[in-house]
Design a protein with these regions (language model features):
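Auxiliary Fe-S-binding modules of radical SAM enzymes
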Residues: 1-11, 172, 176, 187-192
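Canonical Radical SAM [4Fe-4S] cluster-binding loop centered on the CxxxCxxC motif
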Residues: 4-44, 55-56
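Intrinsically disordered, low-complexity acidic/polar segments
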Residues: 23, 36, 101, 163-165, ...
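A short acidic, helix-capping loop that chelates divalent metal ions and anchors anionic groups
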Residues: 32-36, 122-129, 190-192
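Radical SAM/AdoMet-radical enzyme domain recognition
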Residues: 43-62, 71-174, 182
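Conserved G/P- and acidic residue-centered "switch" motifs that form tight phosphate/ATP-binding loops
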Residues: 67
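Ligand-binding loop in jelly-roll beta-barrel domains
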Residues: 179
Length: 192
């Protein structure tokens, strides 16, 4: 399968929920409508779609949300994706709040890597950005993933007047720990 520019498409992103346990102001501001339960695909539907895409040459699937770890049984989806012929890699984008407690099941299911959203190393600023006091849980999730050998990539979204000075501190983590840091452009959701 190829895109309109002739590039081979090998990557599928599955957004398994619109729910999140954080309220980052650039992603989940107040007033963003939630989907009705019947508007969200079941895991069986996701697996059927992934199998169809695999037959067209997709070999990598990224599980995202919202926050995918808030959806019950997400490790079963990972396991099912890994069982699809042609799917070589299953990754997840997460805020890592629930990663420490769910890491054993995800590791057993075959999760290949995680991208973790982290915009600051300052707990007070983290609480301001996310409207939640979960910095310690995120740090524990990062440590748990690294400890179990799951490759980690940190995604940092710099915001003018908020955390633009954090990029260097986050980048320094890559010198101390076996992880990568990626700075990504802010893409506001729900603003028209």
């Amino acid at each position: 399968m190829f895109d309109s520019k002739g590039r081979k498409i090998h990557y599928l992103r599955l957004s398994v929920t619109d729910l999140c346990n954080l309220r980052c102001r650039y992603c989940m501001p107040d007033g963003v409508d939630k989907l009705e339960r019947e508007d969200i695909l079941t895991y069986e539907e996701f697996l059927r779609l992934a199998a169809l895409f695999a037959r067209c040459g997709v070999d990598t699937v990224r599980v995202t949300g919202g926050e995918p770890l808030v959806r019950k049984g997400v490790e079963q989806l990972v396991k099912g994706l890994k069982a699809i012929p042609g799917i070589r890699k299953v990754t997840m984008t997460t805020n890592a709040v629930l990663l420490e407690q769910q890491r054993p099941a995800l590791r057993e299911a075959g999760l290949d890597s995680v991208n973790i959203s982290l915009d600051t190393l300052d707990p007070a600023l983290f609480a301001k950005i996310t409207a939640r006091d979960e910095f310690a849980a995120v740090q524990a999730g990062i440590h748990a993933a690294l400890e179990s050998g799951i490759p980690v990539k940190l995604n940092c979204v710099p915001q003018v007047g908020v955390n633009e000075g954090e990029r260097e501190a986050l980048a320094a983590l890559a010198q101390d720990k076996p992880l990568q840091v990626r700075v990504i452009e802010m893409m506001p959701i729900g603003y028209g």
